[in-house]
């Protein structure tokens, strides 16, 4: 797991869903692992990969294959995501559509609707009163400068926690 200590509570005012949209775009390539090659390599070296954004954090989960080279490759890819992510405008519309579908699926569940209404009643339409996934009008208003600024501000070693568990050589990983 790589956990960034930033979530939807850090979304700029009027830009709800920015942290979640960035999470989606963070699978689309870096300076050294271009475009969809990033996701292809994640798929090659993991049994499963996923991500989520909540109010306080953004998490990237990788269940790494048991081959010795797999862990090193995933650590490399996560370091690329942390320091060399390339955000591309061409992916934004399709990722907004995915976020929109995720929101529809979530809001199709009665408990989620209840929680959303309770949080809105308690906090209004800001901070904890809005879902981390954001609202469509706000998502559509997010621009590349805002995404890049959020990334540069929050995706950094001093704002991340990496958790590695399983059978591996601790000394080798730390080197």
PLM region spans:
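Short amphipathic beta-strand starts and helix->beta connectors
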Residues: 43-47, 141-149
